[in-house]
Amino acid sequence: SVTVKENLKGKFYAYNVFGEYPEFQGKKDVVDPYAKCVIGKTGRAMVINEKSYGKKDPLRSNVPLSSSVVYEIHMRDISISEDAGTTFGGKYLALTQDKTAYQEKAVKGKKAAKVSTLLSHIKELGVNTVQIMPIQDFDNDESNENEYGWGYMPRYFNSPDGIYSSNWKDDSKIREVRKMVASLHKNGLRAILDVVYNHTAEGFYGEGIYSFNAFVPYFYYRFGNGYISNGSGCGNELRSEAPMVRKFIIETLRFWTEFYDFDGFRFDLMGLIDLETMREIVKELSAVKPDIFIYGE
């Protein structure tokens, strides 16, 4: 650890890694894999003050997990249409607006009706749990609002992706994700985050190296007979059974539970995560939220 006697909020930092691995060519600036606010496609880690983001809003629901009705949403798809009735199309903040609706056009002989959208629509369906497709920083160009992605190629697991924020260049995404979760809670809805811990967007050469393969080349990924394992079909597999990888997964999930107040997690390709790690995840997160909702494919 290091102590710096000045206010570093909003400043950027990186680790300078050097070693014998040929890809470093001596040394390389690397983004902190634990960074909580990563900016831009190439990635820059911003220093934040967690205490500056205000209070959380507790879940206002007594519905038992056994009675869960889960509604899956894509952050952009649910609100990008002009008919969604929001001023925050495609953004986190779209789920913070109440009483949004689409006004039907009047047709001769038929009265024009208002059709509820977003939170109002979700509640009308009788849903009590909202599952949000991946928003952890993924492989995309945050500056391009027209770029589309599902989020299943993660890069930096503690940072929300900026493409759904009002300003991708700063920490707006942190404040806005917290507001979104608080809004769901205020409306009696559990917030579930779809997470990807079976693989990453990282490669093994050149610009494809983000953090893991820079700090400890090859350690974070599985290999079989000298080849990269690819049970995910996405290029690699995280070696969840390795102590430091398991520690990383648990600590990042705990952060999303404590800081963002998510009520549970849906695991993409859970079958690629070892059983001991999954048991530890349930144990650790249950200590934070006894009714944590954990499930996956």
Predicted regions and their residues:
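Substrate-binding/active-site clefts of carbohydrate-active enzymes
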Residues: 76-260, 278-289, 293
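Acidic-and-aromatic substrate-binding clefts and catalytic sites of carbohydrate-active enzymes
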Residues: 270-276
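Conserved alpha/beta catalytic core and glycan-binding cleft of carbohydrate-active enzymes
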Residues: 35-41, 46-48, 261, 282-297
